[in-house]
Amino acid sequence: MKNKEVGVYVHIPFCKQKCYYCDFVSYCQKDSIIERYINAVKKEIRLQNIQAPITTIYIGGGTPSYIESDYIREIIGEIKKKNVIEKPEITIEVNPGTVTIDKLRIYRSCGINRLSIGLQTTNDELLKQIGRIHNYEQFLETYKMARKVGFKNINIDLMLGLPNQRIKDLKDSLEEVIKLNPKHISVYSLIVEEGTPIANKIQKGELVLPDEETERNMYWYVKNTLELNGYKHYEISNFAKEGYESKHNQNCWKQKQYFGFGAAAHSYRDITRYSNTPNIEEYIKNIEAERLDKNRTIHEIQKEYDMEKEYMLLGLRQIEGININDFKAKFVKNPIYVFRNELKKLTDEELIVVEGSTIKLTNKGIDLANLVWEEFV
């Protein structure tokens, strides 16, 4: 790993209130433990030997903007003691209702140059139904403050397929967001996870999801509208102005290495994928005892064929698809031969197309992407 670039992910698992659809590792009403947790994260960073240059840092959650900005500054300061390139991409996730202009100024001063703001929808009634703590007006205030303090590279998160969401609601949201001219827009379909409050409400009939056809129509409306407005569709759920694609996420999709710090954080190093314990108390205790290994669960030690399959799966998340020559350069094999059976099946079903030196999803394949990815799991 000496000459390979790496990314860093830091997990801040604290929230003001958990959204009704959220299945991520996050905790409310744990404020008393925040300082110990931040100290543990800083210690974990110190204990980790990272030789390779760090090109991207991503601070996610939870709601990282919920905690004091000084904690964020301390974490970034600790990472910067490592081999960080001169101008890394540093992203932090921000939720409206949890930031002030002073917090944003501190983010800028410690090198954060990309914000990801969770809006989800401009419809206040829908925001309430999914358990968001903010309204659209608070989002606008956050966005304007961010621009005022000098943030140019801003992502806005939207969601489609929400309970009781109509195509008109989505059109209105998209129209308002496009007016703001952010550099990046992510649009995710709601995934109903078992055991979440939203799943329980749907089961009881209190909330109704749009049908599959409506949800797909929403997706294609988003894709077409954003492309007409100068956004490049570069990954299933992501759109960017030229040159503003998320470098951190792109590196993950290109199978590059990354170190995860904090409870529940995932890492990919050499041929190993592992994650830290999701239990905050256990995480802190093990870090304080300098037992990094006790926090870790190894999910996979990859053989070459595992890496090849994963390369295909991750590559087919990207709209430009897989460059056959890049695959050959990495694995000294031709993917057309290695995956001849899978590719024939997917081509026959018109889910992928092989064009010149590229393998990519068709429009039908974008709609049925899960079926495509299943072939490489």
Question: What name fits each language-model region?
Answer:
Residues 3-5, 26-48, 55-333:
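C-terminal scaffold of the Radical SAM
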Residues 13-26:
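Local cysteine-cluster metal-coordination motifs and their immediate loop/turn environment
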Residues 8-11:
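Short active-site neighborhood of thiol/selenol oxidoreductases, capturing the structured segment around
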Residues 358-362:
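Minor-groove-contacting beta-hairpin "wing" of winged helix-turn-helix DNA-binding domains
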Residues 364-377:
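Short, amphipathic alpha-helical interaction segments positioned at domain boundaries
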Residues 347-357:
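A short, conserved structural fragment
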Residues 333-345:
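Short amphipathic alpha-helical interaction segments
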